[in-house]
């Protein structure tokens, strides 16, 4: 059986001593899309951000338990969080391109890491924008401001910015919730194509999105992991009443 790329063991997350995640244990596997679903406040985004230690940015956040990435304890004092977030990248709910050109957005992380060779940067821009399925739409205006793009294009440029740093895992926190249906569909198609090269963890409020593109789905409620299975099993044969109530719209 395939070894998990990320293992979470007995994870609890607190904000100012209030528990947001309660003793969660689960594994994530390479080259899959795993959807995290649940009502607002269920803990799914908190869990996502615990994986690459984004919670460190909140002084009121405390974490207990373990998160392992490729066998390494993410919360070890020896962990370099900059390197960690390069390998486990993140795309947020609202498109957040920097106020600079499309080109400079994509190479931002590479420049921070000291890469100056124009040929290397040019190649990274083209490959990353192609990977994010937006190259054909922007290739003739790479030096225009990314802020002039549509919301869907901006979000795909943000995906490209993550891809340029060569991550192994991509965390996505409701990446289509601020987009129109056509733009959301393009993002979904992009994510589905990326799973052959990356591991993707997707927080979504859309049951249809989870069922369309994910291979596994986890259902959270009040900080608890209620159910975790293949997406097909989750939607066709849920094992818990709370899961069934949520995916059928009785709980939300």
From Swiss-Prot:
SMART domains according to UniProt: AAA (SM00382)
A single BP term in Gene Ontology: phosphate ion transmembrane transport
Keywords: ATP-binding, Cell membrane, Membrane, Nucleotide-binding, Phosphate transport, Translocase, Transport
Top enzyme category: translocase
Provenance organism: Streptococcus thermophilus (strain ATCC BAA-250 / LMG 18311)
Compartment(s) where it occurs, according to its Swiss-Prot or TrEMBL record: Cell membrane
Protein name, as recorded: Phosphate import ATP-binding protein PstB 2
Family: Belongs to the ABC transporter superfamily. Phosphate importer (TC 3.A.1.7) family.
């Amino acid at each position: 059986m395939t070894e998990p790329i990320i293992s979470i063991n007995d994870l609890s997350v607190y904000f100012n001593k209030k528990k947001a995640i309660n003793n969660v244990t689960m594994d994530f596997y390479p080259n899959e899309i795993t959807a995290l679903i649940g009502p607002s406040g269920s803990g799914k985004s908190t869990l996502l951000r615990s994986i690459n230690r984004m919670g460190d940015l909140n002084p009121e956040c405390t974490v207990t338990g373990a998160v392992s990435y490729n066998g390494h304890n993410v919360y070890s004092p020896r962990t370099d969080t900059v390197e960690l977030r390069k390998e486990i990248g993140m795309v947020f709910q609202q498109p957040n391109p920097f106020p600079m050109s499309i080109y400079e957005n994509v190479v931002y992380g590479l420049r921070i890491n000291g890469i100056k060779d124009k040929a290397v940067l040019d190649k990274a821009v083209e490959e990353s924008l192609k990977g994010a399925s937006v190259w054909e739409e922007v290739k003739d205006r790479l030096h225009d401001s990314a802020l002039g793009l549509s919301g869907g294009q901006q979000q795909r440029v943000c995906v490209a910015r993550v891809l340029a740093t060569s991550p192994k895992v991509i965390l996505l926190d409701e990446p289509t919730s601020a987009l129109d249906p056509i733009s959301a569909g393009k993002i979904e198609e992009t994510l589905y194509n990326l799973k052959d090269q990356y591991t993707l963890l997707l927080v979504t409020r859309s049951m249809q999105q989870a069922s369309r593109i994910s291979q596994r789905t986890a259902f959270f409620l009040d900080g608890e992991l209620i159910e975790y299975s293949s997406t097909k099993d989750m939607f066709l044969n849920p094992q818990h009443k709370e899961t069934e109530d949520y995916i059928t719209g009785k709980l939300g």
